[in-house]
Amino acid sequence: MQSIPIKNVGESRLVDPFQRQYYYLRLSITDQCNFRCTYCLPDGYQPEANKPSFLTLKEIIHLAQAFAEMGTEKIRLTGGEPTLRKDFISIAESIANIDGIRQLAVTTNGYRMAKDVADWKQAGITSINVSVDSLDPKMFHQITGINKFDDVMRGIDRAFEVGYNKVKVNSVLMKNLNDKEFEQFLAWVKHRPIQMRFIELMQTGEMDSFFDRYHLSGQILADKLLKNGWTLQHKSHTDGPAKVFTHPDYAGEIGLIMPYEKNFCASCNRLRVSAKGKLHLCLFGEEGIELRDLLQSHEQQAILQARIFAALQGKREHHYLHIGDTGVRNHLASIGG
């Protein structure tokens, strides 16, 4: 069994061969989604017959405890759409109460926010990311396949009402679809404490033609921001991959996630676990390392942690998107994007 380094205060025991420390776990709790986004699940969620069920609450707790003991400080609940789980609140409460977990985030399509966000806050969710790919209701419907724009907007407003100081909003940048709305998004965050994050469209196995048609480099937006007085901010050790820009005249912020940028992987600090219990070292990587067999009792914790650490020693220095290698993933919904 490979030895795991002793953790000092403020350090993670999860260290890869390139000395990157991992403080952040993206945990998918379901593959199911009720939206049909063109860049993710254009045909809607298709359940796979005779496949394992999603991780149980008990298994999720064992997993989160193991990662927390190894230095993970932030867990993000993803999907699919994580709030479709009937035990979503129980999952959030359980993780929020684990020693060492300082941040518990959720990425959601926002369709339940207006009704449920107060319960999320009470359960211990500290931050929310909402997907809003257009501020035009018709374009929103075209991209998501669902006519829920007004519901999502009400949910964002409700999040501020119940006490969230900031909401992060994700938009997948697509040429000739929503790229013309950049100025509209800027106006939207002028007086709202929203971090508006534009995510470059990423190539996946079954979406090659879509990528070729709609991909647009985020560097175009970065250049525009810098030209107009926006300033790039320093990242903390638990932050995600976004480059965040601020402006003294704006209450909100702009984030850019540009996976094709040089050195994108140099600051990687996050691992992923799928809804069925596989560890993924990279969004564009391998088939995954099975963890579920070691999530059945607390007595398995040391073996579980050793398996996680050993797997991490096989992490690549960077992805290979720049040469068209998208890994084995046909789409990103199965491991939370």
Curated annotation (Swiss-Prot):
Residue sites binding S-adenosyl-L-methionine per the record = 39, 80, 131, 202
Cofactor needs:
[4Fe-4S] cluster
Q: Which Pfam families match?
A: Fer4_12 (PF13353), Mob_synth_C (PF06463), Radical_SAM (PF04055)
Q: Where does [4Fe-4S] cluster 2 bind?
A: 265, 268, 282
PROSITE patterns registered for this protein in UniProt: MOAA_NIFB_PQQE (PS01305), RADICAL_SAM (PS51918)
Top EC class, one word: lyase
Pathway this chain belongs to: Cofactor biosynthesis; molybdopterin biosynthesis
GO MF annotations for this entry?
4 iron, 4 sulfur cluster binding; cyclic pyranopterin monophosphate synthase activity; GTP 3',8'-cyclase activity; GTP binding; metal ion binding; S-adenosyl-L-methionine binding
Which controlled-vocabulary keywords does the entry list? Answer: 4Fe-4S, GTP-binding, Iron, Iron-sulfur, Lyase, Metal-binding, Molybdenum cofactor biosynthesis, Nucleotide-binding, S-adenosyl-L-methionine
- Boundaries of every Radical SAM core domain copy: 17-243
Q: How is the cofactor bound?
A: Binds 2 [4Fe-4S] clusters. Binds 1 [4Fe-4S] cluster coordinated with 3 cysteines and an exchangeable S-adenosyl-L-methionine and 1 [4Fe-4S] cluster coordinated with 3 cysteines and the GTP-derived substrate.
Q: Which InterPro entries match?
A: Aldolase_TIM, Elp3/MiaA/NifB-like_rSAM, MoaA, MoaA_NifB_PqqE_Fe-S-bd_CS, MoaA_twitch, MoCo_biosynth_MoaA/MoaC, rSAM
Signal as a keyword?
Answer: no
Q: Which residues bind [4Fe-4S] cluster 1?
A: 33, 37, 40
Binding-site positions, GTP: 26, 76, 107, 168, 270-272
Q: S-adenosyl-L-methionine as a keyword?
A: yes
Task: Please list the GO biological process terms of this entry.
Answer: Mo-molybdopterin cofactor biosynthetic process
Q: Provide the catalytic activity annotation.
A: GTP + AH2 + S-adenosyl-L-methionine = (8S)-3',8-cyclo-7,8-dihydroguanosine 5'-triphosphate + 5'-deoxyadenosine + L-methionine + A + H(+)
Task of the protein? Catalyzes the cyclization of GTP to (8S)-3',8-cyclo-7,8-dihydroguanosine 5'-triphosphate.
Quaternary structure, from the entry: Monomer and homodimer.
Q: Which PANTHER family match?
A: GTP 3',8-CYCLASE, MOLYBDOPTERIN COFACTOR SYNTHESIS PROTEIN A
Family indicated by similarity? Belongs to the radical SAM superfamily. MoaA family.
Name the NCBIfam families for this protein.
Answer: moaA
Its name, as the record gives it, is GTP 3',8-cyclase
